[in-house]
Each structure stands twice: as structure tokens, then as C-alpha cells.
């Protein structure tokens, strides 16, 4: 449940809800387990938000791994089929998951479009240093709408300075409530 609480806090509460918009273009760097996508889908249905969700993943998890993930059982057992669908959707095609939620899983590393919210969910800088490069942040910043939000777990000073150097205003937040 720790990963679930952190994902809700960092991405849903601190970014998606903080955007204050009813129609939101979301970019996720790192689809991974699909947890952030699933939480965003559920939020869109509950709050009536129209979400255009683009996610990048160069190394998708295999079906034998994703089928074992139990997030729906912990969050919304009636949504198990939606969670499975998020993983089974074709890559590089926009798919309407519901009238309010469109998913575009990209198996690429170049950005297109303008985003209101960015979930930067790459592995830690020590594990995946190439993802935390100033060049990547500059590219993301150039695709962010005015007043757009980038949210990440990383609180390292070095990463904060890189974000600021390309134009981001950086704010720190306390961790998730216990």
C-alpha cells in the first residue's frame, strides 16, 4: 500500500488535482506497472475529468508480470478489467478507454503535443541517470502548457537545480500522510 499512497500523493493530489482543470493533457514518463495510469483513469471517472493521457515506456513489462499485479484488488476490485485493458491496449495508437479517458501508450522517446501535467516517474537518478539529464527536462518544459505542472518523487538538490535551470519553478511538498 506504500507505493499506492505515494502515487496518489505525488501524482493525483499534487499534480492532477492541483491543475484545477476539467480537461487535462497528461504526460507520463515511465508507464511501468500502469499504477499512475490506473489511478488517473479512476479519478477521471469519479470527478468527470476529460483526460488525454500519453505515456512513454521503452521497456514495457511482460504480460506475465502485469497479470500478477494486484492494484485493482487494493483500489477498485470492480475495475480489474480496466486495469488489464490499460496493459493490453496497442502501443502507438490512441485508444478511448471511456468517453472521458483516452490512452496513448508510446513506444518512443520523442515528445509531441502540449501537456498540462507531467508525471515524471523514471527510476532514481542513480539507477537511470540518462533520464534525469537537463536536456530531457528542457524538452519536457518546451511541451508544457503555461502554468503546467511536473511532479516527481525525486527531491535531490541536483535534480531541483536542473529543473530550475531550464525554467521550472520548483516547490517541495511533504511526503504522503501516514
Where are these regions (language model features)?
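A short glycine-rich, Lys/Arg-flanked "PGG" loop and its adjoining helix->strand segment in the class I
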Residues: 130-147
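Class I S-adenosyl-L-methionine
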Residues: 156-178
Amino acid at each position: 500500500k506504500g507505493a499506492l499512497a505515494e502515487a496518489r500523493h505525488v501524482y493525483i493530489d499534487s499534480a492532477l488535482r492541483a491543475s484545477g482543470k476539467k480537461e487535462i493533457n497528461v504526460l507520463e514518463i515511465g508507464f511501468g506497472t500502469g499504477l499512475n495510469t490506473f489511478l488517473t483513469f479512476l479519478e477521471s471517472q469519479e470527478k468527470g475529468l476529460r483526460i488525454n493521457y500519453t505515456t512513454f515506456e521503452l521497456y514495457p513489462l511482460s504480460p506475465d508480470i502485469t497479470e500478477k499485479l494486484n492494484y485493482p484488488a487494493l483500489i477498485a476490485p470492480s475495475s480489474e478489467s480496466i486495469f488489464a485493458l490499460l496493459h493490453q491496449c496497442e502501443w502507438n495508437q490512441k485508444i478511448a478507454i471511456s468517453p472521458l479517458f483516452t490512452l496513448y501508450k508510446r513506444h518512443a522517446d520523442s515528445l509531441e503535443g502540449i501537456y498540462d501535467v507531467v508525471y515524471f516517474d523514471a527510476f532514481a537518478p542513480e539507477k537511470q541517470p540518462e533520464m534525469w539529464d537537463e536536456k530531457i527536462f528542457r524538452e519536457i518544459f518546451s511541451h508544457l502548457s503555461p502554468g503546467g505542472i511536473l511532479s516527481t518523487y525525486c527531491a535531490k538538490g541536483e535534480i531541483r537545480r536542473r529543473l530550475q535551470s531550464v525554467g521550472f519553478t520548483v516547490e517541495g511538498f511533504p511526503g504522503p500522510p501516514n
